[in-house]
Amino acid sequence: MLSLKSEVLARHLPLFNGKSILLFGNVRDRFADQIRSISSHVAIFSHYFDYARHYNDVEFGLDCTTPANLGVFYWTKNKQECHYQLLQWLSQTAIGQQMLIIGENRAGVRSVEKLLSPFGQIAKIDSARRCGLYHFELQTIPQFDCQKFWKSYRLADLTVLSLPAAFSSTELDAGSQLLLSSFTNQDRLTGNVLDLGCGAGVIGAYLKQRFPAISLTMSDIHSMAIHSAQATLAKNKLTGTVIASDVFSHINDRFDLIVSNPPFHDDIDTAYHTVESLIMQAKNHLNYGGELRIVANAFLPYPDLLDKAFGSHQVVTKSNKFKVYSARV
C-alpha cells in the first residue's frame, strides 16, 4: 500500500524514466518497486531502523553519500531533521543535481522553498492528497557542517548531546523528568539495565552516572538518536552499549530493569503499536524479579495493557499530566 506522498509521486512516473533514483527521508512504503522497471537503478536510504530492517535493499545510517540522477526526498515533520538530510546529501552532489521533495502540507513541506531557494531553482509542480511536490535543481553546492546541528544541555552534572531527530534533543522533557525523579537512592540499581527508545540518551546516561554498577544498554530506531546517545555517553565518560532495534527486534539479552519514555506519535499521527509491543514483550526480556518502568501521558490506556502482560502494576509517581508505571515479573 502506497503512502499519500507516494501516490502523488506516482502521478509523475515519466520523471523517473531511465534515471538512477535515490529515495530517502521518511520513506515508509515500497514505491521503489513501482519504478524499478522504468528506472536504471533505485536506491533507498533511511534513518529509520523500524523501516530499514524489513528490506535488504534499504541502507540504514546517518549520512547518505549515494549518488543518483534524481534524488527523491520524503519530508518529515521535524524540519531540522529535514534540513540536515537535505543539505548533507546535496553537499555531496554536483551543480545541476535534480531533486524532488514530497511532503504533507500539515508537516510543513512548504518551508522547503525557503530552505533550498538559496541553492538553486525550486518550484511546486503538483498539489494533491494534501501533499505538495517540489522540483529542485542545484546551482550552488551548500556547505554542510554537521557540528551546527548538534545541541547540548545540562542535567545536574550530566551533559546531553543530540542531533535534531533525537527525543529530548534540546531540553529534558517533563515526562522524562518525572521518570528520573522516581528513582531514589533506595533503589540501589545493579545488574543489566535497558533504556528502550533512548533518544539522546538522557535517561540511560543519568542512571549510569547515578548508579555506576549497572550494565547499560540503550536502543532506538533512529540513526540520529543512536549517534546522539553514543555522544552523550562519551561526553560524560560513561560506558554503555547503544544499538539499533525496533522495540525488541534486535535485543537478545535479559534485563533487571527496562526503562522507557516510549513514543506514541508516528511522524504526525498518533500510534500506540510501539508501546503495545514494548509492554506485551517486556516480560520475555526481564530476569526474575525484573522491572519495567515507563512514563506516559496520564490519559493513555496503558494500565490495562500492563495488567494483561504482568498481572498487575503500580503507579510509582504522577503529575497533572504524566504517570510513571511499574510492573514486575
Curated annotation (Swiss-Prot):
Oligomeric form and interacting partners: Monomer.
Keywords: Cytoplasm, Methyltransferase, rRNA processing, S-adenosyl-L-methionine, Transferase
Subcellular location: Cytoplasm
Gene3D superfamilies: Vaccinia Virus protein VP39 (3.40.50.150)
Organism expressing this protein natively: Haemophilus ducreyi (strain 35000HP / ATCC 700724)
Catalysis performed (reactions): guanosine(1207) in 16S rRNA + S-adenosyl-L-methionine = N(2)-methylguanosine(1207) in 16S rRNA + S-adenosyl-L-homocysteine + H(+)
Any one GO molecular function term: 16S rRNA (guanine(1207)-N(2))-methyltransferase activity
A GO CC annotation given for this chain: cytoplasm
Keyword Transmembrane helix: no
Role noted for this protein: Specifically methylates the guanine in position 1207 of 16S rRNA in the 30S particle.
EC code(s) of this entry: 2.1.1.172
Record's protein name: Ribosomal RNA small subunit methyltransferase C
NCBIfam families recorded: PRK09489.1
One of the Pfam families matching this protein, by short name: MTS_N
Family as reported in the entry's similarity comment: Belongs to the methyltransferase superfamily. RsmC family.
